[in-house]
Amino acid sequence: MKVRSSVKKRCEKCRIIKRNGRIMVICENPRHKQKQG
């Protein structure tokens, strides 16, 4: 899980979602997981 100021999709399978007021990227590839911090 990377914590970044700007989260972006890194492939077609990445999905941007909002959890607990935070924007996150979830993907099949675990390396693409990101969280806005």
From Swiss-Prot:
Record GO biological process: translation
Keywords: Ribonucleoprotein, Ribosomal protein
Organism superkingdom: Bacteria
Pfam families attached to this UniProt entry: Ribosomal_L36
Coiled coil (UniProt feature): none
Keyword Ribonucleoprotein included in the entry's annotation: yes
Gene Ontology MF, one: structural constituent of ribosome
GO (cellular component) term, any one: cytoplasm
Family (UniProt): Belongs to the bacterial ribosomal protein bL36 family.
HAMAP family in alphabetical order: Ribosomal_bL36
The protein, known as: Large ribosomal subunit protein bL36
